[in-house]
């Protein structure tokens, strides 16, 4: 959450520490978000989910992850003007992230 607040002030998001280590900003398609949260951010508080206009990103590449799925990776900073919406992801009583209404149809894992 703090990283995003800083990005909004500067106009540029350079990614999380994990993104910087990997050399790109990790993205997920809408239907991949629930699994990404479960796998990489279990019970993590103060998360912000960004909805981005991917058509305006020049350095976005789709690459295969270790689970075999294709994920978008941004090999540049993210200009905040390409962020269409932002959602806080509070935790429910079980420590599961509450999805915004737009993503609730994806709250179950997708078939592979």
Task: Name these PLM-found stretches.
Residues 1-112:
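Conserved, structured core segments of small domains
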């Amino acid at each position: 959450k703090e990283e995003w607040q800083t990005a909004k002030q500067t106009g540029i998001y350079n990614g999380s520490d994990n993104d910087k280590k990997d050399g790109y900003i990790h993205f997920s398609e809408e239907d991949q978000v629930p699994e990404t949260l479960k796998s990489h951010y279990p019970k993590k508080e103060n998360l912000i989910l960004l909805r981005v206009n991917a058509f305006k990103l020049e350095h976005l590449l789709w690459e295969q992850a270790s689970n075999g799925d294709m994920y978008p990776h941004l090999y540049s900073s993210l200009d905040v003007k390409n962020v269409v919406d932002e959602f806080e992801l509070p935790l429910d009583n079980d420590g599961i992230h509450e999805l915004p209404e737009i993503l609730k149809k994806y709250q179950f894992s997708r078939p592979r």
